[in-house]
Amino acid sequence: PVVKNNNKIPIFSAKLFYSNKTVNSFEIFEPNKYYLLNIWSSWCVPCRQEHSLLMDLAKNKNINVLGLNYKDTKINAKKFLEELGNPYKKIIFDNNGVKAIEWGAFGVPESFLIYNNKVLEKYVGPLNQDFVKKIKLLIK
């Protein structure tokens, strides 16, 4: 289900998945760009179901798909991405689940459509074709 929002994104610092570099929210989310932040885990069955939609959306130059890897291990997360592909420009590593809570997430998967440091919409559960079509229309 879609939740209308328009709240500012949380201000945070976190480690990037591959580089282990600590970054803050202002470094990740640039103004005047669309982002889809997808909270996912390798152990999450619905995350597998939505993954092909994320791979498709990642091909669109008008949006940056970012991942927040939730309560996972790097080994399992890397296997997941090697098997299904990596749609994410950047991945935030959240092995203890704290960053997801800061976003107001209750589980996985959840996705946030972001523009100018504001959450335009939050999508709870696996993405579907209808929501992805809506995103593509919005970011044209």
Report the location of each language-model feature:
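N-terminal targeting signals for export/organelle localization
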Residues: 1-16, 136, 140
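A short beta-strand-turn-helix
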Residues: 13-35
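Short pre-active-site segment immediately N-terminal to redox-active cysteine/selenocysteine motifs
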Residues: 33-35, 39-43, 107
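Short alpha-helical
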Residues: 45, 72-76, 98, 129-130
